[in-house]
A protein has these predicted regions:
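Sec-dependent signal peptide recognition
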Residues: 2-7
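Extracellular/secretory-pathway and virion-surface proteins
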Residues: 18-193
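Hydrophobic h-region of N-terminal signal peptides that target proteins for export
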Residues: 9-17
């Protein structure tokens, strides 16, 4: 009787192992069989809550922009394209724009003296690994006009970002596991913009 129980238990374990390996092979075949299609989404400042653009200064040094990433997407690339204008009177060798994604530094751009007073575009590549379901992109202005003492209220310290500035996010779809706890995803995702 004991031998029959051992045999039944061994067969039960083997069938479970065979089912798991068959499912794993099916998932791998599905992943390898389909090419990952990258989806690109571009949001301008108006769509991210800044319809009039943003003016950063020595007092108001940063702005937060929010974007949602769907549960069934993986961010593969991100680019911030800022349409900016800043005055000529500041020290451009000591003035920067820093970009944080979810409170992690992702990019820095020094302000150019050659482009001061002229509207132009600053492109900053962002680290896609820093993006999560709700992503906060913080743009911080660090400007100075004097190497010794700086008055943060000085009108020379300003950076104007136009509303046509954009955040472009490239993503690939992810296969979600069959779990009712994820509902209403993927049919409805509150992070859709």
């Amino acid at each position: 009787m004991r031998h029959i129980l051992y045999l039944a238990f061994a067969l039960f374990c083997l069938t479970g192992h065979a089912q798991e390996s068959a499912e794993a092979n099916t998932l791998v075949a599905n992943v390898e069989g389909t090419a990952a299609i990258e989806r690109s989404r571009t949001l301008n400042f108006t769509e991210m809550g800044q319809p009039n653009g943003v003016r950063l200064s020595g007092i108001n040094r940063f702005v937060d922009l929010n974007s949602g990433i769907r549960l069934d997407e993986l961010v593969t690339r991100a680019n911030l394209s800022l349409r900016v204008l800043y005055p000529q009177g500041m020290r451009h060798d000591q003035s920067f724009v820093r970009v944080y994604v979810n409170n992690q530094l992702s990019g820095i751009s020094q302000l150019s003296v050659a482009r001061a007073g002229v509207p132009h575009t600053i492109n900053i590549e962002l680290d896609p690994l820093l993006f999560s379901d709700f992503a906060t992109v913080r743009i911080e202005y660090d400007g100075t006009y004097d190497s010794e003492c700086v008055d943060p209220g000085n009108p020379t310290l300003r950076l104007d970002m136009r509303p046509e500035s954009t955040l472009t996010i490239g993503s690939t779809p992810l296969n979600l596991v069959n779990d009712l706890a994820l509902l209403p995803a993927p049919f409805f995702d509150p992070r859709d913009n």
